[in-house]
Regions:
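Short, flexible coil/linker elements and helix-boundary hinge sites characteristic
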Residues: 25, 90, 158, 239-242
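Detector for Asparagine
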Residues: 35, 42, 62, 79, ...
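Extended amphipathic alpha-helical interaction segments
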Residues: 100-212
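Leu/Val/Ala/Ile-rich N-terminal alpha-helices, chiefly Sec-type signal peptides and the beginnings
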Residues: 6-11, 20-120
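A cross-kingdom marker for long, charged
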Residues: 205-242
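Hydrophobic core
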Residues: 16-18
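Positively charged n-region of N-terminal signal peptides that target proteins for export
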Residues: 1-5
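Generic surface-pattern signal
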Residues: 43-53, 66, 70, 82, ...
Length: 242
């Protein structure tokens, strides 16, 4: 009986050793997967860590944002974070492209004054579209960065609260102290667009009082010229903050 008891005890010890080895194996695997996830978050954060949106390497951004390297539950976490980042930066890229591709900063040049004046229908339409795009991007960004919206991305993973802090830490890189940086960056262009629109309105209103002479706009009375100068001063003030 002692021999059988020894065998039973030996088997029990062996089972415990195997269980312990399996437990530590699981722990190591989980840690490796967590580290892989953290590496992806850090790489993504470094890619977008620029002073201006225009400085982001979009090829590098798209490569990492579309890749999926994590495994297990961290794969769901990675997908949630990258989906959130993609949505956030697609909005910013949209407004950046709209501003960069627009000719709004050329609308008061002599060539455009002659070609599109005095009604400036083409210029007005472009300004209206640009303003609508910028306002839409601001609205979408505000909605997406709302706390409840960010939580929704995590909720869709179906993961337990245990993983929530990892998600929150990752997406907080897009908020925190820089939460309003994007919105603030659009305020000056918005003011510039508004100021240009005001100048065009004034030129249409006074279309019989000015003409383009070479590289200059010439008014046929001082009051009209002085008022035009005030509009230009307002435009320069708005543009100076860009």
């Amino acid at each position: 009986m002692k021999k059988k008891t020894g065998i039973i005890i030996g088997c029990a010890v062996l089972v415990l050793v195997i269980a312990a080895a399996a437990f530590f194996g699981i722990r190591i695997t989980d840690l490796e997967r967590q580290n892989a996830y953290i590496d992806q978050v850090n790489e993504l954060a470094e890619t977008v860590d620029t002073e201006y949106i225009s400085e982001i390497d979009r090829d590098a951004f798209n490569t990492i944002i579309d890749s999926r390297v994590c495994k297990g539950k961290y794969a769901k976490l990675e997908n949630a974070v990258k989906s959130y980042y993609k949505a956030i930066y697609e909005i910013q890229f949209q407004s950046e492209d709209a501003l960069q591709n627009s000719s709004y900063d050329q609308m008061l040049m002599p060539e455009n004054l002659k070609a599109d004046g005095p009604e400036f229908e083409k210029s007005r339409a472009e300004l209206a579209q640009l303003s609508e795009t910028v306002d839409s991007c601001i609205s979408q960004y505000n909605e997406l960065t709302a706390e409840e919206k960010a939580k929704q991305y995590f909720a869709e993973t179906g993961l337990s609260k245990k993983y929530e802090s990892l998600f929150n830490d990752a997406v907080s890189i897009t908020s925190g102290t820089s939460e309003n940086a994007y919105i603030e960056s659009l305020q000056s262009p918005k003011k510039t667009i508004s100021a240009i629109s005001a100048v065009l309105d004034y030129l249409t209103e006074t279309k019989n009082q000015w003409s383009v002479d070479g590289e200059k706009i010439v008014f046929n009375n001082k009051d009209a010229a002085d008022k035009y100068g005030e509009y230009i001063a307002a435009l320069e003030a708005a543009h100076a903050n860009q």
